[in-house]
Structures are given as structure tokens and as C-alpha cells.
Curated annotation (Swiss-Prot):
Gene: proS
Native source organism of the sequence: Paraburkholderia phymatum (strain DSM 17167 / CIP 108236 / LMG 21445 / STM815) (Burkholderia phymatum)
Protein name from the UniProt record: Proline--tRNA ligase
Stated role: Catalyzes the attachment of proline to tRNA(Pro) in a two-step reaction: proline is first activated by ATP to form Pro-AMP and then transferred to the acceptor end of tRNA(Pro). As ProRS can inadvertently accommodate and process non-cognate amino acids such as alanine and cysteine, to avoid such errors it has two additional distinct editing activities against alanine. One activity is designated as 'pretransfer' editing and involves the tRNA(Pro)-independent hydrolysis of activated Ala-AMP.
Main location: cytoplasm
Biological process terms in GO annotation: prolyl-tRNA aminoacylation
Catalytic activity: tRNA(Pro) + L-proline + ATP = L-prolyl-tRNA(Pro) + AMP + diphosphate
Top EC category: ligase
Amino acid sequence: MKASRFFIGTLKEAPADAEIVSHKLMVRAGMIRRVAGGIYNYLPIGLRSIRKVEAIVREEMNRAGAIELLMPAVQPAELWQESGRWEKYGPELLRFKDRKQSDFVIGPTHEEVVTDIARGQIKSYRQLPVNFYQVQTKFRDEIRPRFGVMRGREFIMKDAYSFDKDMDGLRESYRKMYDAYVRIFTRLGLDFRAVAADNGSIGGSGSHEFHVIADTGEDDIAYCPTSDFASNVEAAEALPLIAERAAPKEELRKTSTPGKAKCEAVAEHLNIPLEKTIKSIILATENEGAEPTIWLLMLRGDHDLNEIKVNKLPGLGEFRFATEEEIVEWFGTPPGYLGPLNTKKPIKVIADRTVANMSDFVVGTNEVDFHTTGVNWGRDLPEPVVADIRNVKKDDPSPDGKGVIDICRGIEVGHVFQLGTKYSEAMNATFLDESGKPQPMQMGCYGIGITRILGAAIEQNFDDKGIIWPESIAPFEVVLCPMGYDRSDAVREQADKLHDELTAAGIDVILDDRGERPGVMFADWELIGVPHRLVIGERGLKDGKIEYQGRRDAEATLLPVEAAAQAVIDKIHAALAR
């Protein structure tokens, strides 16, 4: 490939709306251009990297036994109504009517369509298992698209859907996809972690997310540096921080805390550790034809409520936060001084695991400007219902017992789900088992954000000059920079020879024959992020040398002319083998 025959659209400045590094660099490197909010053109440089990501994904999906197909981006509303997601999926689902006033959607995901395929084509257990996948453009009408391709509205995704006859089969399909994802993200050259996760709006049971580790990530990842444990913070089990409850040492005492409505202010006023205070969170659940049930959830003052965990507790599946009017009716005081003692009306109390093992703690008195100190279970309060209702924190014990938790930020680039029969039962996707009885298919779904991977990779691989691509997804692996290509026969002949040698060896190479000044030429390719650069100049050729510099190298080195091509080939192969 010669640069004069290729489109290079680099910019000196990033657009004003670009907030994170990947967005800035993808625009400046000529990879993307904005069409509308969250919608982008992918220019030739960007498309080359997309195609390389897709190629690796396809290779590993095929290796895992998945079969490629292609489903339509436009889907009829009837399928979504049948699954129940027409009502449940929020405004992110782009809905429209055709000229016949029939309802359609632009697919953000394809569970309904693929289930429709399966129920129409799969009749017997002999046809199972099967795993269909596609690489398709999706649309999700994000309320606030931002960060370039990281949170766009239109995006390219690989989605796969497995169908099995039983749970053992589903678990095996899930394992194959999980292993394939590990291979994919390893080959892409990404620093990633697979973390246990919540299934969210997709539904189902088991779930893992694959996160690229980056400071700009939107998700908090809890992991143990000394073991393999990793989990989304929302899904990580929070163990009790106190192994055994100590005997009471303090008397129950009503204490003045004027204007101290927050745990931090109470701790400072009483000159006690924040860890001795209790945060009271009031929830409500509806009862048909009767007043709501009011719940008091007790957390240590330095801990945060995990709403996903709470939502899974018996009786709290559809909780809401209590209104101030309800709080006053049940507790006799507005928020800020609430606690489980002396409530006006009966409540249900749930204590976090750590709170359940505390002694001599501080709660609100249910009276403005007062708290109660020296509170103890059994003596002052009945033993509570105990549950894990908080987010884990840094230095918490790891749930696997092999160290302590650390927290990092992650960018989700892949997700695998065990759906079970959520869609097959709703849409009557059945097969005949060995005894001739109809059974619902066990489903799994497995997604990878193709375009998001580009942004995530850049967030891990950049410097003040631009992108530093991993070899496997760089738009070009090698750039040849001849000094005076149009003026020197020796330079042109050697550059062309290197180009042909590298191309013959299967290396993705571009020769910059644009006639730009060296500074402009180098700046462009450093911005674009090509991993390897060879500079061919008359002076070096007279000495039998060509200048080589890796994109991560601080200094250039000289290579013998006759060995330069092979040296670069070896470096690329070594990088791809890591």
C-alpha cells in the first residue's frame, strides 16, 4: 500500500466535544468523523482496524464451533411483544412505523429474532446444540451519547446465541464462549479481566463481563491481586468486616447532635470513628389495598447501599425509596436522624453483615438533633435479619479467601450470559426430546462490542504523540518513511524493495510516498500509531543502514539494509505470539 493512493485525514486539533483520550485520538488520527450524536463515519484508517478486530473474533468463534449468519437490523414489533420486552425495554429502543403503520424497531440486540429462527428450524434434540453468531450494526438510543465510540448510539457488535437441550449443555456452550473470549481479548493485545456480573435487562442466570482495564472506564471492578477473583463491584460479595460480635461495653444513651444529619458529621461531633456510626436507609414496598411496608436497611457509616443486591432479597423485588411523608409517618422525624429504636409504626429491619456483628454503635434517635450511642443487638434491639446489601470496598477481604480486594476502573467490551429458558418459554421455542416430549431450549447469549474495542485499546495504549496500537489491530503494522522518495533513485528503489519483501511475507505495510517533510510524516504515523517504522535515507544507505524505531521505543536503532525486513518481521511475529 502506498500512502499517495490511500486516504489519510489526520488533524492537529481534537474537536471541542471530545472528552477522553480515545475520542480525541480517533478523530485526530482520521479514524472517525461525527455524523450525528453518537453516530460516526469510519474512515479508511479506522475501518482497517475494525476489520482486523472482526477477523480475530470470527476466527475464534469458528474455532469454538459457532456458525455465522446475518439477521436484519430492522425487526418487527411482534417479536418484541411476544418476548415481553416491547413494554420493558426503555426509550433506548428505537421504534418506528412503516408506511403501512406497522411497528418496527432498530435492533439493539437480537434475542427475539434468533429465537424465532430457532423455533422455526430446530425440531429435534438431534439438531442441538447449535450456536449462531453474527457481526452486525446495532442501534441503542442513548440519552446522552458521549466519549466517541465508547458510548455511541450506532455501533458494530458481534453477538452469538447458543441453543442446548439441557442445562449441562448450556454450561458447556457457555464455557466454550468464555474460553473463546479469553483468547480473543488476549490476541487483541488488551489488558483485561473477566468479572462476575449482574444480568441486567437481558435476563437469565449466570453472567460474566469482560473489561479492559483503564482509568477512564465507567465501571468499578473489584479484584484480588493475589488470586483470580474479579467481579463487577455491583455483583461482588461483601463479607463481614467483623468476624465476631464483641460484648457490650457502653450504656444506651441519647446524645445531642445538633445539625449533624450525616454520619460523617456525627462521627466528628462525637469524636468517634465513622465505622461506629450506622447509616439508615428507608425503603418501601407496595401492598395491594393496604398501606406500604416500610423497611429500614442498616449500613455502616462508611459503606454504600447496593441496590442490585437489595432487589434480589425476599419481599424487596420491586422496592422504592420511601417518601419524606412516609418517613415522617413511620419514624416521627424527617431524614437525618433515623434509626430502628422507638419508631411510630412497625417496620422491617435488615442489617448488613458487618452491622450485624457490631457492638456499641450509633443510630438516629428518631428525633431531630439527637442520636443514640451504645446501641447493641440483643440488649437494645432484637436480632436482625442479616443480608449482604453493600458494595465492596478496597481492602475488604476477597470472597475467595485468598487476599484483599482492590478496585480499578474497567471498560466493558464483552458480556456472556446464561439465559436459560427466558426467551424460549416466552416465544415457545421448543424441541422434541429423546422421549418425544416438547422441551424449551436452553439459551445463552454472548456479545462483543467491535467498535468499542478500538476506543478501549486506545485508552490503554497512547502517549503524548498519539496512539500505540497492539500489532494485531493496528491499521498498518509497518510504515516505510523514505527521505526524498521522489528525488533519489537509491531511496526509492530500496523503499520499494522493502515494501515488496514485507508484503510478500504477509506484513501489512504502507509506504509514505506523499513527499511530506520528515517532521510531518513522522508526526502523522506516530499519531496514527503504526507499531514499526523504517526510515530510508541516502546517508544511511551509503553506510548500509536503515533506521528502525518501534512506536514504544524511546530511541531509534540502525539495522543493516539486507537484514532490515527480516528484523521487523521477527519483531512482529514475536509481538503477535505474546
